[in-house]
Structure formats: structure tokens, C-alpha cells
Amino acid sequence: MKAFENNIKKIFGARVRALRTEKGWSQEDFAFECGLHRTYIGAVERGERNILLENIKKIANTFRIDIAELF
């Protein structure tokens, strides 16, 4: 189960990073738009954080996409 948890966090983080860079946003700009801290966004993108559902919603809203599109 631990391997799955780590893998899903890395996949999610890679998707967030891809969408962010596609928009041309720095981590700092993106974090500001989401209402989150830059270091938190960095940790999410590296797959180091077990992200809260509330923060997934903030990220999806910032990208103006459905939550499902983050996975």
C-alpha cells in the first residue's frame, strides 16, 4: 500500500507541475493564486505531501478545471 500511496502522490504532483508550467506560472505565482504557500506547492509537485481534499479543490479552481482532470 505504501508504494501505491507514494506513486499516486508523484503522479498527482507531476500533473500539477505540468499544468502550472503550461500556464507559464512560477510556483510562487501559482501558490498565491491558490491561497497556498510556495513550499507547500513544491512539496506537492515532488510527491512529498499527502494533499488535503480542500487543497485539491483550490488547485482545480485555480486551473479552472474539474478535480477529475488532475488525475
Question: Which residues make up each language-model segment?
Answer:
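Short, conserved catalytic or interaction motifs in soluble domains
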Residues: 3, 46, 65
